[in-house]
Amino acid sequence: MKNNDSDNFNFDSFSNLDWYKSVNSNLLDLADLNSSNKIIDLGCGNGGITEMILSKVKDVSSIVIFAVDSSSSAISLALKRFSNRKDVIINYIQSEAQNLHENIKEKVDTVIYCNSIHYVEEKEKVLQHIGNGLERGGKFAFNTSFFDGSHPKETEAFLRKWMLKSLRLLRSEYNLKPVKNKVQSRIQLSPENYEELLLK
């Protein structure tokens, strides 16, 4: 949307939902973080996932976390959340996912990317950069609740109408308009599409 400053936007309320925490906790369990020394929390938001990472690692003093988000307000929330933690190194980086390789030059053991890959326009390029930034045997764990097939077919008409109504409201009450070059990032891939991208 025009006039939408992503620097000042965050998903604080959403990231505190119980189901969101549960799904991401399971993803972190699958990633088995205890063999990781350097971890990127991509799309770190308010630090909720970073906090989960810390709770799952046995020796937090042996790790470095790169907490990355495009939103300065989200980074501020994360900074506040961990302001009293002196037992772990957390490097906060404001960056879009597609610029990750420009902002973190060293290789890492694990990249965690919870529920935000669907916002990325050039998914293939981002996944290549993530792969190139991993140590040999490194891990990339991600999820998304927005993929082709995530909504029952019978709800698609409702979702389209809801989106159109939302756009009209934003236009009429706030003079906001869609940014044309952001539309591509909302095209939802299927799980098979993601698998193909990961195997390239």
Which positions does each model-derived feature cover?
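Short glycine-centered segments of the SAM/dcSAM-binding site in methyltransferase folds
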Residues: 38, 138-139
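A short acidic, Gly/Pro-enriched loop at the edge of an enzyme's catalytic core
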Residues: 102-111
